[in-house]
Regions:
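Short active-site-adjacent helix-start/loop capping segments
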Residues: 1-3, 72-73
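Internal alpha/beta core interface subdomains
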Residues: 3, 81-203
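Ligand-binding beta-strand-loop-alpha-helix segment within the catalytic cores
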Residues: 7-72, 80-85, 138-144, 149-157, ...
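Short, solvent-exposed loop/turn segments at secondary-structure junctions
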Residues: 71-74, 113-114
Length: 203
């Protein structure tokens, strides 16, 4: 999303905060040393970060935050918290709510889980052993924005998930059936074809 908003390539491996990778794998290539990306009236502004700029935001503004889990049927999104004081979400969500900023979670359908995420977050808040650096699960009030919403917004077509998973690198994939007028469908399929040529996010 950042790359598309900027309109240019950048070092994505330097814009990684939380991450999920195979157990025991080396993720030292993933950094978090690039500044937050902030736009005001369509133009990028430098020298500010999310925790600072959110105090100037209000109704009509968007705050984008990825999600670790979604439940599409219940319209829920949740973020795993791997920081002792809540990370970016912990530092901003109170201001986001009080200033009526629109919190949007862009996340792939691959993040779908068959769980009530509010109930799951309550269970995870109980004392007990935990594998990895996860302090909790934060079920938010934010809006979901998946491939379904993206295709509807860009091409005014309907996307229906009909399959998930695969082999040889397609383990996190989803299969969508698309419905709409011929021309937007053809345009969407052409773009999807280009996206499918992109390599995995790895060193």
């Amino acid at each position: 999303i950042v790359e598309e908003l900027l309109g240019e390539a950048f070092e994505k491996n330097r814009y990684v905060t939380g991450r999920t990778a195979p157990a025991g794998s080396d993720t030292s290539w993933a950094k978090a040393d690039l500044p937050d990306v902030v736009f005001r009236k369509g133009k990028r502004i430098d020298g500010v970060d999310a925790t600072g700029i959110v105090k100037e935001m209000g109704p009509g503004d968007l705050f984008l935050k990825g999600a670790n889990a979604i439940n599409y049927d219940l319209d829920q999104a949740a973020v795993l918290i791997g920081h002792p004081v809540g990370g970016t979400l912990g530092a901003t969500v109170g201001t986001v709510v009080s200033r009526k900023v629109r919190l949007v979670h862009p996340a792939g359908i691959e993040k779908s889980v068959p769980t009530d995420l509010v109930a799951a977050s309550q269970r995870l808040s109980q004392e007990g052993p935990c594998m990895g650096d996860v302090y909790g699960l934060w079920a938010t009030h934010g809006e979901l924005f998946t491939e379904i919403e993206a295709l509807a917004a860009l091409f005014d077509i309907e996307a229906v998930p009909v399959g998930a998973g695969g082999i040889a690198g397609a383990e996190g994939s989803v299969t969508l059936s698309l419905f709409g007028e011929k021309e937007p469908l053809e345009t969407a399929l052409a773009l999807i074809g280009e996206i499918q040529k992109e390599g995995p996010f790895a060193p």
